[in-house]
Amino acid sequence: MAEEQPQVELFVKAGSDGAKIGNCPFSQRLFMVLWLKGVTFNVTTVDTKRRTETVQKLCPGGQLPFLLYGTEVHTDTNKIEEFLEAVLCPPRYPKLAALNPESNTAGLDIFAKFSAYIKNSNPALNDNLEKGLLKALKVLDNYLTSPLPEEVDETSAEDEGVSQRKFLDGNELTLADCNLLPKLHIVQVVCKKYRGFTIPEAFRGVHRYLSNAYAREEFASTCPDDEEIELAYEQVAKALK
């Protein structure tokens, strides 16, 4: 007889109306992980201005997101992800860890470069900060267009050419994608709104990656509305003056 699954509930940051999903890449990351695991779960949005008594009791002063697994409360996004990968494991649930360690770090400096770019108000520094962001995006593009070891035919003398894989670590979404994609989505939305910047078409690997990701429900349906992201960055994004 199959072991009964404990109740799983993910508490995430609510949007401006206190009900819909707000801007939080960590919340989206865990939302994606649970969806990809194929586990039955509930998502509860928490209005940070008006935390209910139930939420306060479960996680007093705790940072969002947090997870209720049965009667256990889990905090810290990285630890929650590790916990879910350990308890929701094969054969009943898919393993989501990337095969290639490099996939876990690909593109991870993009968000820091983006933050520096968007928070800058000095026009004299803008070009260099934009170049820094472009350089980080180019590194990701190179990774996405370079064949993974498993794509290389050792017996062939021919050049393997450009990788056509859909995601960071192959044709299936992994924990690496759950970490990177929510951040890349924020970069796209905020840069377009506050800097008129879009990811260059020349970065075909990045565009292919995003196109494949938006075609997946686990990513597209967990994204907050663009307006929520824009609102979250309204005070953060500095006007150039």
UniProtKB/Swiss-Prot annotation:
Bilayer topology annotation: Single-pass membrane protein
Record GO biological process: chloride transport; platelet aggregation; positive regulation of osteoblast differentiation; regulation of mitochondrial membrane potential; signal transduction
Listed EC numbers: 1.8.-.-, 1.8.5.1
Modification sites for N-acetylalanine: 2
Residues holding glutathione: 24, 64, 77
Reported modifications of this chain: Hydrogen peroxide treatment causes a conformation change, leading to dimerization and formation of an intramolecular disulfide bond between Cys-24 and Cys-59.
N6-acetyllysine PTM sites in chain numbering: 13, 119, 131
Cystines in this chain: 24-59
Primary localisation category: nucleus
Location within or outside the cell: Nucleus; Nucleus membrane; Cytoplasm; Cell membrane
Family affiliation: Belongs to the chloride channel CLIC family.
Full protein name: Chloride intracellular channel protein 1
Record organism: Homo sapiens (Human)
Lineage: Eukaryota, Metazoa, Chordata, Craniata, Vertebrata
Gene designation per UniProt: CLIC1
